[in-house]
Amino acid sequence: MSDTSPNYHTLQSIGWPWPGPPEDPAWQAIFAAHPQALPARVVEQHRTGYVVADTPEASLKAESLPEWQRPRFPSHERAAVGDWVLMEGKRIVALLPRRTSIKRGAAGEHYHQQVIAANIDTVFIVCGLDADFNPRRIERYLLLVGGGGAEPVVVLTKADQTEYAEDALAVLEELEAQNIALRAVNAKDPESVAALRPWLGDGRTAVLVGSSGAGKSTLTNTLLGTQKMKTNAVRENDSRGRHTTTHRALIPLPSGACLIDTPGMRELKPTGEEDLAEGGFSDVEALAAQCRFNDCAHIAEPGCAVRAAIEADQLDPERVANYMKLRVEVASAAEKLATRVAQNNRGKGSGKRPASVDRPGRR
């Protein structure tokens, strides 16, 4: 880690978004408030703390802000892998606003958000072309990505192990029709994985998400050209794998991009901030706007454009059922979010709560 002044050239090699000092006024204000601090990126997140870096080769364990240690401090306002922070020695003194992120509703009865990765350009949604293949799960991931500012790319792995690759691609034709990129690869074959190069250029950051056993760690190793990430075999009867990746980590690639590998996630709850139109259901939302009734449930109402499309074989009924389920989940989470925001605003009035660091937007 540098102890004098920022080297923006080396910072660019781990995803710094500008050729020199920050151009975002919000970032500039935070830099001005901490004139002795230096920028670094969070490259690992553990239960006990963080690892940060200012070059691809140099990293150190960082001491987090004291308020992050409080049990009731919102988890999405703590640093996540991919975040940019300001450091004084080994101490994190400020968290810079996020340009993009992917979040989920944290498990449990109470409303919480969890940031999966921050300041990312691309989210690779990884799903195996075996018993792991689940279009409904892919749609759920697309919903979480939508609105966060990053581009989703669906990556179907294990294309060498199944005869059903073409059938799987046919199932996802509706997504491709919405300009959602889709690639089928053999995660062990460098030539096959080269299909992902357009999203892994110099200075870009991508994150891998998907269930355990989908091939994320294998894909990471192939992109690295070395066996850095541990991989496990999956069970043949259901294609389920053990959690190979145990923590989130940002890894520089030979291409000049950065890749964030994540553990498999069993639960994918919306945060309430999602937009179904941006989350893979723009066609269904467009049809819903044509229904006779504004509150159409798309079940048996007269003049329902969605039901008409299903009957004309223009929409997959299972996909529409998932859309309806997710719509209810998003609405429920949005109510909880509104309650939490109202509580936070009252707390801010008394000086008890900090502002959010999330400012989603395209890089």
Swiss-Prot record:
Cofactor: binding comment: Binds 1 zinc ion per subunit.
Gene Ontology molecular function, alphabetical: GTP binding; GTPase activity; metal ion binding; rRNA binding
Domain CP-type G: 112-268
InterPro entries linked: G_CP_dom, P-loop_NTPase, Ribosome_biogen_GTPase_RsgA, RsgA_GTPase_dom
Region (Disordered): 340-363
Keywords noted in UniProt: Cytoplasm, GTP-binding, Hydrolase, Metal-binding, Nucleotide-binding, Ribosome biogenesis, RNA-binding, rRNA-binding, Zinc
Protein location: Cytoplasm
GO biological process, one term: ribosomal small subunit biogenesis
Gene Ontology cellular component terms for the protein in this record: cytoplasm
EC code(s) of this entry: 3.6.1.-
Predominant subcellular localization, coarse grouping: cytoplasm
Residues holding Zn(2+): C291, C296, H298, C304
Cofactor dependence: Zn(2+)
Subunit structure: Monomer. Associates with 30S ribosomal subunit, binds 16S rRNA.
Functional description taken from the UniProt entry: One of several proteins that assist in the late maturation steps of the functional core of the 30S ribosomal subunit. Helps release RbfA from mature subunits. May play a role in the assembly of ribosomal proteins into the subunit. Circularly permuted GTPase that catalyzes slow GTP hydrolysis, GTPase activity is stimulated by the 30S ribosomal subunit.
NCBIfam families the UniProt entry points to: ribosome small subunit-dependent GTPase A (TIGR00157)
Homology family: Belongs to the TRAFAC class YlqF/YawG GTPase family. RsgA subfamily.
Name by which UniProt lists this protein: Small ribosomal subunit biogenesis GTPase RsgA
Recorded name of the encoding gene: rsgA
